[in-house]
Amino acid sequence: MNIKGKHYRTVWVSGDGKAVEIIDQTKLPFKFEVVALTSAEMAATAIQDMWVRGAPLIGVVAAYGIALGMNHDASDMGLQRYYDLLIKTRPTAINLKWALDRMIDTLKDLCVSERKDVAWALAAEIAEEDVALCEQIGLHGAEVIREIAQKKPAGSVVNILTHCNAGWLATVDWGTALSPIYKAHENGIPVHVWVDETRPRNQGGLTAFELGSHGIPHTLIADNAGGHLMQHGDVDLCIVGTDRTTARGDVCNKIGTYLKALAAHDNHVPFYVALPSPTIDWTIEDGKSIPIEQRDGKEQSHVYGINPQGELSWVNTAPEGTRCGNYAFDVTPARYITGFITERGVCAASKSALADMFADLKSKALQGEQH
């Protein structure tokens, strides 16, 4: 992503190779600050407190968390301790477990003296893979947008609705749901994005920050405005991300995604999910089996932003002592999804389509579970 003319990724290794640097997303879009993570404990805090967020990025930072841990204690006990520390930070996003399992499976049979270097190399490999996957999703998704553009009068704008932030800030680079939009924009297809504010963490502000940095027209809307826009023909398609997708195609994503899918279904608006393969949980069929994270009620009862003095602060919006139900995710059944935009192409949201497209990965994942 370009910020004031300079390209950034969301995570990178420091110049001295001893730390992992991230962009503190809790300060965006008001302040751009880089934080150096120097331990597995700091990586865990960064994930838990949402300095970084988005399923793919969480996985990458967790992998680097293991590498950071190997700097301090590469013993069997240390490896397991860092795994246990990181795995409990965010229970819903499957990329976290996928990345940590990959790290521990590779490191556990190595000599202690070899683990540090291999851990850093593998974490970097996982990061590079994420960039490649997301760019491919963008290329395939841009064709979906092009097909819709071709059905409209020449020069007409394609209006796309997205929920939460599944862009560059949710991955290492490019993003998932926003990657097709970036590619379409680069290819000269006129697009406009309806950006859900996405309460309570207001990730829509992050999406607006991204799109604005790339010069892509967009409008920030209240979460409940999407259905109205669809009823009036102002949405050509929806593209969202996913934190975990089951083997049969049910999608767990940011709370409110399900309601957007229902509105899209009722108004015959195509509803696509940008799906990188590491986000598929082949061990779960029914989306109801996915653990749904419940976060601190303060996120619900307070708003975090910048005050007139230019300071970041919390503002209470509810009576003191109000009980809050802060569910972070919901599940959209596969029947409401038009298709998955993956790194290998676009497929139907069904068990058979996913199994056909990713037969090799499914087999490998299930074999790993058996061991």
From Swiss-Prot:
User: What start-end ranges are recorded for coiled-coil regions in this protein?
Assistant: none
Catalysed reaction equations from the record: 5-(methylsulfanyl)-alpha-D-ribose 1-phosphate = 5-(methylsulfanyl)-D-ribulose 1-phosphate; 5-deoxy-alpha-D-ribose 1-phosphate = 5-deoxy-D-ribulose 1-phosphate
| UniProt source species | Escherichia coli O45:K1 (strain S88 / ExPEC)
Give the disruption phenotype, in one or two sentences: Inactivation of the gene precludes growth of the strain with 5-deoxyribose.
Name of the protein in question: Methylthioribose-1-phosphate isomerase
Site annotation (Transition state stabilizer): which residues? Answer: C164
Q: Which residues are listed for substrate binding in this entry?
A: R53, G54, A55, R90, Q203, N253, K254
Does the record bear Isomerase in its keywords? yes
